[in-house]
């Protein structure tokens, strides 16, 4: 959240061509839009966006195919330069359970727990269009979304 990504509607499901970063940034934008829209759809619940940045995990293990050496090298560098998942959790979990957070649904937080602004291109119109396209994709497999 808050990194300026608005998502790419022309090939939302990467069926025409696949680009790892393009697909990843679509999910980043989509997650941010889910927070923004959920605040409006479900006013009795709280929603927050998290942008931890790059964290050392196994989530990228398929990104480099089966090249375990390259994966190990890259994850090792990431581990040296960025916080671990545990360090991020130590910082963010107390924030997410703080009583002062009540009433601030829709806020996005960066890797240090500071509030950040939503991406500027995520207008109400764009969010509705993107989420409608997402709902059409999942409807193809028989899943419907309640509004």
Task: Locate the predicted segments by residue.
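Alpha-helix termini
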Residues: 38-42, 98-102, 145
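Generic C-terminal helix-cap and adjacent flexible tail
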Residues: 139-147
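C-terminal helical subdomain
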Residues: 30, 45, 49, 72-140
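Catalytic loop of short-chain dehydrogenase/reductase
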Residues: 1-44, 51-69, 74-77, 81
